[in-house]
Amino acid sequence: MTKLIVYSKEKNPQCDELKGVLNEVGIPYHEVDIRKPEVIMELHKNGCHSLEPPVIKVVHARSTQQFFKNDDLFWDGQLVREAILDVMHLSRPSLS
């Protein structure tokens, strides 16, 4: 099973937008405050040096993990909704 962790901070429009899309699509996630020193150390230890929220970590069943930074999820300040589906390896709903 795939687990999603969202590293975010309060009152951040991009974090709110990302969480809104995750809720809308029905993707469960665990939220962590990216401003905490121990969280920053954990991210750095795992090779993720971007602290511009949101950052997401996807942990796959085989214990492999991937980090996706703000730049991976947003283009020109806008959330790329398809990126969320790609991150979770979900198929896109067909447009009718």
Task: State each model region's role.
Residues N46-K57:
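Structural micro-motif
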Residues M1-H30:
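Local sequence-structure signature of Cys/Sec-based thiol-disulfide redox active-site neighborhoods
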Residues M41-K45, T64:
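Short secondary-structure transition/capping segments
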Residues V58-L95:
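Non-catalytic, surface beta->alpha helical segment in thiol-disulfide oxidoreductase systems
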